[in-house]
Amino acid sequence: GRCGCHGYKATAGWRFGNLIDGTQAEYVLVPDAQANLAPIPDGLSDEQVLMCPDIMSTGFKGAENANIRIGDTVVVFAQGPIGLCATAGARLMGATTIITVDGNDHRLGISKKMGADVTLNFNNCDVVDEIMKLTGGRGADASIEALGLQSTFESALRVLKPGGTLSSLGVYSSDLTIPLSAFAAGLGDNVRRWIWPCRD
């Protein structure tokens, strides 16, 4: 079959797209291709596998970093392609309840097909209040932020139960402000960021 990028777990890791230019090009030289590429089965079109190398792996890694366990309530903020894949990943990881947040009803409808149990349009309600009501005031076990805005990051933080896990996938254009009270609530060990990992 044809080959497609394996995603972040490939042994090249952070080098793809950061130290090796051109990974969005039609062709790219892949070091250690035997370990860093996975075959795409014959019979699948380019359109069917288009999101696998970057978008799907990013969304699924966000769900993996959220430490989701069976029985957990997970909130996924933003339902663009990466957020939708994070929603599917949360379902596959065993989340019992998945709440998705977006401002676009069409995307929220797709998120239902990807595994969401409850969808919230931020144009129609205060999503933090609504999520706290849905969780009986307890908060979510995990939240995944897939947009990259201060406001969505803050909301993802505010809906967590004490000690909950925030998995951040968004690319932020400026520095984030995180209230110190979040660390007092036990968040310090449970904020996980995947998109900009440290180099060795």
Model-predicted regions and their roles:
Residues 126-132, 151-152:
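Short acidic active-site motifs
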Residues 134-142:
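A glycine-rich helix->loop->beta "capping" turn
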Residues 39-125, 129, 142:
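Mid-domain Rossmann-like dinucleotide-binding core that forms the NAD(H)/NADP(H) cofactor-binding site
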